[in-house]
């Protein structure tokens, strides 16, 4: 008989507070196996892995938590701490100021939240449209018309954001390196030229896949190929 998620989470939280981090991880992962996920759950798993000094796994689950709650300060702080513990300190490619502003706005919410915002704004648009068509008051009709237009444009904009984030999440997948030392190759072949070396815990962006090889890009813009088995996808 399956144990309810609430009981598993309660048990895992208790084990964590008692310093039984491996047991806590086991029970948290059972909750995920049951089909449940939340930023808090992933955050707790990340903290548990951090306590046993498994930084790659900690970063993986902090990143999963961040994908759901991108503005959570605790998640961001712990993720930064975990990243400071790994071997590689990769400098990110500088962004133009308007690109940085756009990315900040774009990443304010998860894809689900942007979708909910779109639905809410569209419902408001329909309400103003209904008042416009049903009202006989000239000034009210004019007000509802312009508000309706503005809200319609906003709903199109937020729908575009939601769709773009969803498309990005499907086409481009981020992953964490789980191999202690990994040599990145120039092509999807173990006999190809060595390009550079990265280590466990580094986040990579998967941009292509050929057989059992991923083409990846790291934060400084460097691109190369690695075996699929070397990473776990976020």
What are these regions (language model features)?
Residues 55, 142-179, 186-189, 193, ...:
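Boundary regions of SH3-family modules and the immediately adjacent low-complexity/disordered segments
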Residues 93-133:
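Membrane-embedded alpha-helical segments of integral membrane proteins
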């Amino acid at each position: 008989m399956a144990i309810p998620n609430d009981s598993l989470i309660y048990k895992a939280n208790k084990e964590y507070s008692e310093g039984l981090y491996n047991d806590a991880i086991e029970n948290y992962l059972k909750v995920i196996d049951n089909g449940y996920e939340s930023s808090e759950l992933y955050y707790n798993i990340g903290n548990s892995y951090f306590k046993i000094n498994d930084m790659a796994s900690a970063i993986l689950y902090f990143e999963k938590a961040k994908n759901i709650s991108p503005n959570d300060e605790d998640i961001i702080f712990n993720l930064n701490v975990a990243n400071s513990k790994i071997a590689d300190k990769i400098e990110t490619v500088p962004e133009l100021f308007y690109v940085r502003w756009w990315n900040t706005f774009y990443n304010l919410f998860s894809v689900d939240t942007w979708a909910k915002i779109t639905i809410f704004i569209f419902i408001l648009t329909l309400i103003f449209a209904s008042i416009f068509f049903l009202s006989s008051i000239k000034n009210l009709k004019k007000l509802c018309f312009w508000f309706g237009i503005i809200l319609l444009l906003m709903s199109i904009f937020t729908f575009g954001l939601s769709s773009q984030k969803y498309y990005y999440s499907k086409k481009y997948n981020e992953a964490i390196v789980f191999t202690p030392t990994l040599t990145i190759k120039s092509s999807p072949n173990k006999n190809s030229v060595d390009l550079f070396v990265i280590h466990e815990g580094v986040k990579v962006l998967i941009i292509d896949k050929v057989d059992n090889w991923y083409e990846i890009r790291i934060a400084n813009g460097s691109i190369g190929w690695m075996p699929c088995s070397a990473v776990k996808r976020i």
